[in-house]
Each structure stands twice: as C-alpha cells, then as structure tokens.
C-alpha cells in the first residue's frame, strides 16, 4: 500500500506504528520463472526473471542522520571517492563503526537518555549505499520488484534520486515495486541504512548488534498479471499411504482470462499429480492433488516433491512458479506432539546466524556446513533463535531433514531488565506497539508458511505476556491449523494462553520430571534452551535425555547455542584472534557471554558437541552379559529400520584389537532385539566396542559414519596395576638438608629443611622434575565457575596447595622411613597440614624401589569447608615433555559429568593437542578413567600408573596462569609441562552459566576422604 512520507523522518525515529512505507505485502518465498524447465529446478536465482544485486556497492558511513547528504542517491551525485563495500555483509565486519555485543542491555544504554519508542539520534550511524544497475528496455513494460532479504535495522530506498519507500524489522523481507521509478539504461539505487530505529526496541536478542545489508538483494520481474502469493498444505492420510495437497493461489490481474495448472513431480522428475482450474473472481484459486503411495517427509527421510504452478492468460503460459514440498503431518494429540503419527523428541540446538568472518551474513556453504554437522551429530531439530533465518537456510532444512522452530523477530528482554529510568516492559498491552508486533508475526508466517521443515511457530523470545502476544498467538491459531505455537514466556501469568507447549528455558532436570509426574497441565514440554554451552560446559546433559525416554510428555530440547558468536580480528601487533564483547572499545557490552557454542567461532568442533552427539543417538545398547557379548539393542528412530546400517563390533585391550565382526540388524522403529556375539571369556580388563555405521554415502556424510556407539568395559581394573618390581639394592642418605633414596640409575630426593617435599627424581642422571611435587586443590575457573562466584566462594582452596612463592600454606612432614626386602625397598611415611581455616590434613606413603615409586595419598578436608574444585598432585616437568600416551577415556576432553562420549582406549597425542581453545582461556583438556600415562620429552620418560584409576590433566600452564588471561592469543610463552594427577575434579556443570552449580553428585564435598594412589615407573 502506498502512502506519503512524514516530514522529519519520524519513520525510524519516534513512531513505532510506522513499520514500512510503500512496501509490498509479505508473501511466500518464490520466484517467477520463464518456462517449465526453469521452474522445476526450483533454483530461485537461476531464474531468467531475476537478477542478484549482490557484490560491490559504493558506500559511505556517517555519524548520524544529520551528517548524511540528502541527495546522495541522485544520478548526478559524485560517489567515485566513496569506498566499496561487499553486499551482503555487515559494515562493522568491513572496517566501519564498532561491533557491539550485548545480551540483555540495549546498546545505547548509558550513552543516550531515551525511552521507547524513541531511537537514538546522537550515536546512530547511517550507512549510504549506491549501486548502478542497467535496465533493459524490454523491462519497462513489466512489473519490476526489488527485494531486500535482510537489512539491519531500518532503511530508505531511493531509485534515481526518488524516495521509494521505507522498511524496518531487521530479519524480515522488504519488497518494493519500482516499475514507475526505473528507466532504460543506467539506474541508480540508493539505500540509506539506519543502525537503530524504533523497531530496535523489539530486537534485544543476545547477539552482536551490527548494521548494514546482510542478506541477498535482487530484482525480479513479472507480467502485469502475476501470481502474488500461494499457500500449500501437504499432508499424508492417517495411514501414510496417500498424500493430499491443497494449494491456494492468489493472483493479480483480470481473472476472466486467467487459469492455473498444477504439476507435482517426484525426485526423478516424473509427474505424479496434476490439476487445472480457472481463476476466481476473488483472485483466489484452489488447486488440489492426490499423490498415491506417497513418500512422507521426516527428518529421517526428507523426501521432497517439486510442485510447479503455471499461470496462463487465455491458455498461454505467462508465468511459472515452483516449490519443494514434503508431505508430513504435525499435530498435538493427547498432549503429545506427533509427526506422521509418531511421538517426536526434538534433539535440537539453537542457532544464531553468525559467522566470525562475515558477521550476520551467512553464505550457503556455511549454512550447509552447519546443517551437515547437525545431522552428523544426531540432531533432528533447530530453533532459529531469535528471528526468521535466511530463506535459503530453511530450504536446506527441507532438503537435509531438520525440524524447525521458526522464531519471530521479537525479543524485549532488555525492557524487563533495563537500567533506563521509566522504560516500560514491551510489548505487553501497549497499543502503540500492536501494529509493529502483528506485522512481524504476519511477515514470519507469510514468508515461511510453505516450508515443510517448519513444524512450529515461535512468537518470539523473552518478551513476557500481555494483550499483544495474545493477539499474535491468536493470529497464528486462526491462520495455520497444521503447526503448533511456541512462546518462551514462562514468567508471564498468562503463559498458558500464549503457547501450545510448556517451554521453560534452563529448567533443571528435576523440574522437568516434576512437571511430568505431578504438575502436567496437558501440554507437551520442550526446553527451548537448555545445557548452556558457555566455555567448558554441557555437564549433566544426560540427566535430561534420560527423562525424554522415560516420560512421553517431555519431548526434547534445544542446546544454547550452536556456535560461539566471536569475531575474527587482529590485535595491534597484527595477531589474529577471536574477539568478544568489549574488544572493540564498545560500551555497554557483555564480554565473552557470546561464547556459548557447540562449535568455536571458526566453526571447529568442541568436545561438547561430541557429548551431544552421543546423547542424541537413536539407538540404545544395554548389556545383558557384556563378557559373552549378549547385548540388547533398542531402535529409537521414528521411521528407520536398523537394517539401513551396519553394526561393527570389536574387542580390544591396551594391547590393541583382538577380534571383530560386522552385523546387519533387522530392528523396526521402536523395537528391540538381543544379539549374542558369543565372545570368549577373558580374565583381564578389555573393552567391547559397538559402532552403528552408515552403509553408503548420503546427503550429509560418507559411508562408515558412526550414528550410534557404545563401549562396555569387561573385568574392569583387573590386572591393570602391578606391585613395583624389586630389583637393585637402595641406599638411603638421610642428611640435614635432604633424604635421598639412591640406586645405580635412580636418585629420589626429599627436601628436609622446611618443606619435606618430594623435590627431585633423577633417572639415568636426567632430572624429571622442574619443581617439587605439591598438592593442588584448584582448577582454572571455567565460565560456569565464574557464574557461581567460585573464585570468591571457594577461594580458600586457591592457594591451599603448594604454590611457588607462597610459603606455609601446606606444611609437609616426613614421619619415618624403613628399608625392606634386603635393602631393595624403602617405605617413607609422611603427611601434610593444609592451612585452610580450619586446617585440613593429608597422609602420604612413598614406596620406592629401583623400578619406581608408589605414592599413596589420602586427604582429609575439614568438613566445615566448601566443596573443593579438585584434589590432585601437581608436577612441573621440563617443557619438552610433549608426547603423551595414556590408557583412559578419550579421545576428546572429558569430565566426570561429561563423559558419555568418551571411550577407554590407548591414545597417542601431544600436550599441545590436549589444549582446548575456549573463547576465554579456562580449565580444559581433562581425561577421566586413566589407568596409566606416559610422557616423553627429549629422550626422557615420565610414566605413571594409577590404582585403580585417576583423572589426568596435562598442559603447559598452572591453573592460575590460565585464569589470568582473557584471550587465547595472550597465553604466554610456556616454559614447563604441568601434570596434574587427579583423585577427583568437580564436574563442569551446565544447567546455566550465571549461577547454577554442577549436580551435587559431581561436587567434591568436604565430608569425605579423598585417596590418590599411583606409581611413577622408572
């Protein structure tokens, strides 16, 4: 609808009811095609009727609207001295302005004293874009439309100097009919982009706040009579035998001469259904088709048909459009979400559109990478947090098979937490915001209504309730009967009237179970956000996934979040690093709270994703008799028989694999079977490994990809620890300064003056230690630790162990020693007083032979003290101890509350490879279940064996050195190798990152004794 502009530019500045000027109505995503062959390929930008305007544009950034030239879009305006910028792309990612990361706060807080609905005026950069486009004479009698898929956050459009229109809402499409503004030959397109506008009050998502044209820009043409919109409902019958397609087509032009043909093609291009109808006088025509023996669409089998609609004028084709469609049924029945008659569990992730190189702009390659990684990680769902994603991403979700919660572009989190005096909660029931909110939900629906993978609409995020969200909810319920509605508004008193599902983010597992058992209100329960993946996190995720199997109404969740929102940049020395909030001098900001990804900012996989993949797998293996190889296998797929995969099994020990085989299991969805591998019984510890693998390449992975796996430990800890061999006689030299135990090749020395510590181990004349052995009770704070204020709350443990330069925090003693077995074994008994307040105690027994030394440590914390981050013994070795072999859980980093994906094996790695590049340096690289480990450096060997097991952490830094650094690039040059032999380290947690402790079962409480027993082999 056309309207006049208001003088004074109030569109962006102060009037929330103006959300667009001269914009075309929102419609489904489609492109007109010239012929049937073009249309059936369904490649929008391959259409001869479309022209992408992506690429180089002239660009200049101004401080605010008062500084920008009003005539920059005039054909005569000289822009040859302007910069060139890439479109699509955020301008901050190309050297202009400051990127600003904010979670809850609005980015202008503290810099401009404004309240809703006013937009900032002093610091509100305006980017002016200019591009010249050639228009052929043949297009002058056509309808020509320009489309912007995403502009942050508002813009005016100019053609040849004339102001065409205005639009806001960053993540929604904006289209303008420019037919009357263009001319033959060169045409000047001018776009005036405002970083913030009135609509920015509705865009307080946890993300980087950027600016610019960040999605595709293109022109397309139609005849004067054209298809303006269409809606498809494609569902199978109750038996999933036949598919029924109902299509409503809206046309423009004289209906008397118009008709429409429908063709539905299968994957092989065969026509499987047809229909033809004349246009109706209301310009809405219904087409119908039945596809017999239909292939239904699901995340497991995303079969897509191609629908082509031909518009004819007096029997002659004038336009073709197409759409990939899948037949699937989504319903809530008896309080359970079902897809194609089956209960679904959403094994999902949230995903912001963010790339460390390009900001908001997402290339198709990155989109495909993300989806392929999700599929490889057993994910079946994604939530487009917190706005509609690029239409191409949804097309790819159709193609690969992901269930989508399509979230509307509305979050007003900051109005509930604002430091701005007088700032009201939005939108609530405030009438001045109704139009903007309703336009946004309508735009989301209309753009994506034909997307098969969209199974749920989300009204927005963290915006509470009120009359306006109720109207948004009712619009969807009145308009779409084929999907359910979600809204994260748990704290709102009217929450039940706004969402078809219960969705409390970051609910604890016991809260979920309580809902299922005692508080269920008839709705299914989905965790729209859970297991906050900030830094070293995602502990206890298995506590959730177990509940999804146990209670039908608990139907999954979405990890927060997919990828760290970090920006690849360079420091003042030209060194590349991944930046977070505050690194660009911006204020306010929320630091590294943007680092919540299962992938790092450069999209490398984190160990957290390995855990999620394991917990999301669709096959359970349960041991009936693991030693014999009798295993129950349960198929948790909804539609897939396990005979589509191969089960590879192997039996191994620390010496390697010694038997293996392959099976194909015929197990239908939801059913179980028992396999018997008829293994021979073995007396020592060994491991039965099961891996279910793909037989062939598919859309997202190669043949041999592991979709499910399990390991069973047989004869756990049998024959993994032997007594030290007694060989050569020993000499005990007990002088005032030291106590030494000496053999031909070994010299073990304890300091005797003040510390009474194990001070030196020499083997073959080579020193193994760089510093005395000491107790350690600290780990470098994780992001979750910081969230619980562990630095101050547990600070009594930080220096409780022996710390260089700090004396009298642990007082060691040597009580006595004795020589046994004809002088070939020495036992030294000692202890330690740990100077906590009150004091804690330790006892230690050293047993030494010429072949090694056993350390048997028992620690008795005072029960009044808070939990202990870690109980360990710490060694500093020379830095050239780099190569590590260990028998324990791996290959990835693992912790006691995040080790489901870990398998016991003999792993060869390096100390540097154990390090994990979390956005802010923190505790990392741990290994649990370690039986033995050997470090090698410069021909020296440091070998330890645990009784029966320990945790192991090896890196080049002390814990306190790590937590004093804010970026990976600032980690200092290392000069040592730090080995922590750990009795027990606390879990990493992950319920949330702003106060949630790890589960009590994973805490190191002080009402118990801790024991660490190990040997150092010479």
Regions found by a protein language model. Give the residues of each.
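Accessory carbohydrate-binding/adhesion or oligomerization-edge regions at the termini
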Residues: 1-107, 188, 192, 196, ...
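Extended substrate-binding grooves/exosites of carbohydrate-active enzymes
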Residues: 2-45, 104, 162, 201, ...
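Accessory beta-strand-rich segments of carbohydrate-active enzymes
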Residues: 3-20, 24, 43-44, 58-62, ...
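An acidic-aromatic loop/edge-strand motif
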Residues: 90-93, 98, 102-119, 168-170, ...
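Beta-strand/loop-rich accessory regions of lumenal/periplasmic or secreted enzymes
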Residues: 93, 102, 195, 298, ...
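Beta-strand-rich binding/interaction modules
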Residues: 159, 242-278, 285, 631-662, ...
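Extended acidic/polar, glycine-enriched regions
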Residues: 182-184, 250-331, 686-725
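Catalytic cores of secreted or luminal carbohydrate-active enzymes
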Residues: 203-227, 574-632, 636-656, 680-721, ...
């Amino acid at each position: 609808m056309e309207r006049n502009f208001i003088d004074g530019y109030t569109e962006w500045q102060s009037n929330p009811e103006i959300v667009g000027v001269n914009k075309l109505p929102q419609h489904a995503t489609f492109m007109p095609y010239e012929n049937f062959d073009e249309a059936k390929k369904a490649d929008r930008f391959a259409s001869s009727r479309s022209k992408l305007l992506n690429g180089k544009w002239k660009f200049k950034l101004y401080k605010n609207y008062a500084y920008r030239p009003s005539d920059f879009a005039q054909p005569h305006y000289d822009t040859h001295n302007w910069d060139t910028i890439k479109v699509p792309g955020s301008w901050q990612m190309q050297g202009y302005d400051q990127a600003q990361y904010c979670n809850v706060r609005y980015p202008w807080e503290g810099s401009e004293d404004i309240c809703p609905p006013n937009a900032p005026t002093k610091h509100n950069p305006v980017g002016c874009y200019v591009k010249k486009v050639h228009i052929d004479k043949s297009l002058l009698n056509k309808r020509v439309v320009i489309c912007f898929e995403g502009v942050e956050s508002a813009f005016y459009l100019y053609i040849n100097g004339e102001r065409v229109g205005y639009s806001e809402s960053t993540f929604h499409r904006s289209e303008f009919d420019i037919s009357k503004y263009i001319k033959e030959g060169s045409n000047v397109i001018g776009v005036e982009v405002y970083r913030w506008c009135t609509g920015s009050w509705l865009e307080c998502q946890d993300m980087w706040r950027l600016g610019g044209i960040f999605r595709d820009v293109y022109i397309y043409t139609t005849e004067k009579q054209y298809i303006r919109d269409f809606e498809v409902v494609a569902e199978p019958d109750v038996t999933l035998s036949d598919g029924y397609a109902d299509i409503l087509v809206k046309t423009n032009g004289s209906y008397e001469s118009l008709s429409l043909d429908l063709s539905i093609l299968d994957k092989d291009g065969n026509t499987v259904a047809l229909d033809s109808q004349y246009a109706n006088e209301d310009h809405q025509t219904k087409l119908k088709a039945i596809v017999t023996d239909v292939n239904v669409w699901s995340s497991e089998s995303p079969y897509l048909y191609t629908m082509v609609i031909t518009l004819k004028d007096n029997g002659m084709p004038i336009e073709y459009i197409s759409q990939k469609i899948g037949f699937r049924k989504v319903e809530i029945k008896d309080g359970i979400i079902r897809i194609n008659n089956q209960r679904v569990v959403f094994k999902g992730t949230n995903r912001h559109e963010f790339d460390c190189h390009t900001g908001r702009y997402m290339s198709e390659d990155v989109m495909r990478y993300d989806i392929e990684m999700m599929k490889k990680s057993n994910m079946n769902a994604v939530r487009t947090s917190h706005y509609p994603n690029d239409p191409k991403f949804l097309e790819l979700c159709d193609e690969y098979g992901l269930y989508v919660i399509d979230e509307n572009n509305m979050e007003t989190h900051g109005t509930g937490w604002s430091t701005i005096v007088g700032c009201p909660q939005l939108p609530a029931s405030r009438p001045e915001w109704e139009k903007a909110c309703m336009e946004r939900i309508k735009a989301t629906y209309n753009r994506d209504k034909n997307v098969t993978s969209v199974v749920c609409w989300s009204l927005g995020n963290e915006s509470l309730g009120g009359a306006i969200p109720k109207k948004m909810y009712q619009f969807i319920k009145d308009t779409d009967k084929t999907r359910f509605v979600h809204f994260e508004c748990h704290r709102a008193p009217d929450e039940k009237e706004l969402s078809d599902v219960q969705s409390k983010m970051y609910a604890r597992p016991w809260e979920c179970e309580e809902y299922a058992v005692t508080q269920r209100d008839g709705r299914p329960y989905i965790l729209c956000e859970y297991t906050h993946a900030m830094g070293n996190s995602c502990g206890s995720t298995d506590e959730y996934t177990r509940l999804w199997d146990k209670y039908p109404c608990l139907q999954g969740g979405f990890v927060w979040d997919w990828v760290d929102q970090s920006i690849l940049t360079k420091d003042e020395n030209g060194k590349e690093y991944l930046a977070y909030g505050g690194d660009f001098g911006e204020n306010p900001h929320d630091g590294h709270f943007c680092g919540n990804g299962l992938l790092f900012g450069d999209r490398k996989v984190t160990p957290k994703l390995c855990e999620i993949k394991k917990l999301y797998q669709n096959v359970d293996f349960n041991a009936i008799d693991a030693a014999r190889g009798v295993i129950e296998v349960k198929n948790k797929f909804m539609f897939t028989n396990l005979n589509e995969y191969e089960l590879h099994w192997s039996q191994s020990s620390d010496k390697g694999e010694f038997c293996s085989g392959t099976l194909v299991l015929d197990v239908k969805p939801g059913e179980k079977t028992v396999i018997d591998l008829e293994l021979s019984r073995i007396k020592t510890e060994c491991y039965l490994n099961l891996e279910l693998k793909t037989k062939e390449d598919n859309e997202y992975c190669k043949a041999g990809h592991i979709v499910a796996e399990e390991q069973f430990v047989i004869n756990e800890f049998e024959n993994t620890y032997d007594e030290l061999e007694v060989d050569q006689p020993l000499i005990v030299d007990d002088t005032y300064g030291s106590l030494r135990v000496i053999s031909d090749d070994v010299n073990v020395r304890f300091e005797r003056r003040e510390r009474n510590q194990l001070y030196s181990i020499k083997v073959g004349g080579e020193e193994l230690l760089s510093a005395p052995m000491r107790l350690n009770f600290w780990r470098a704070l994780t992001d979750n630790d910081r969230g619980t204020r562990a630095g101050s709350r547990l600070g009594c443990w930080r220096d409780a162990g022996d710390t260089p330069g700090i004396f009298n925090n642990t007082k060691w003693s040597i009580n006595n020693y004795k020589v046994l077995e004809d002088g070939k074994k020495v036992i030294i008994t000692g202890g330690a007083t740990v100077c906590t307040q009150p004091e804690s105690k330790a006892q230690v027994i050293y047993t030494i032979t010429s072949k090694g030394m056993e350390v048997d440590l028992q620690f008795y914390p005072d029960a009044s003290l808070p939990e202990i981050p870690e109980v360990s013994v710490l060694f500093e070795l020379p830095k050239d101890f780099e190569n590590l072999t260990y028998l324990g859980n791996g290959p990835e980093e693992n912790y006691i509350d995040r080790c489901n994906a870990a398998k016991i094996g003999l792993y060869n790695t390096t100390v540097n490879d154990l390090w994990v590049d979390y956005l802010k340096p923190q505790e990392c690289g741990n290994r649990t279940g370690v039986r033995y480990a050997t470090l090698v450096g410069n021909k020296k060997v440091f070998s330890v064996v645990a009784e029966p097991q320990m945790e192991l952490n090896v890196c080049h830094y002390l814990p306190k050195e790590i937590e004093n650094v804010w970026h990976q690039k600032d980690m200092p040059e290392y000069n040592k190798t730090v080995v922590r032999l750990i009795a027990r380290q606390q879990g990493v947690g992950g319920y949330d990152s702003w106060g949630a402790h790890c589960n009590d079962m994973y805490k190191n409480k002080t009402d118990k004794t801790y024991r660490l027993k190990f040997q150092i082999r010479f």
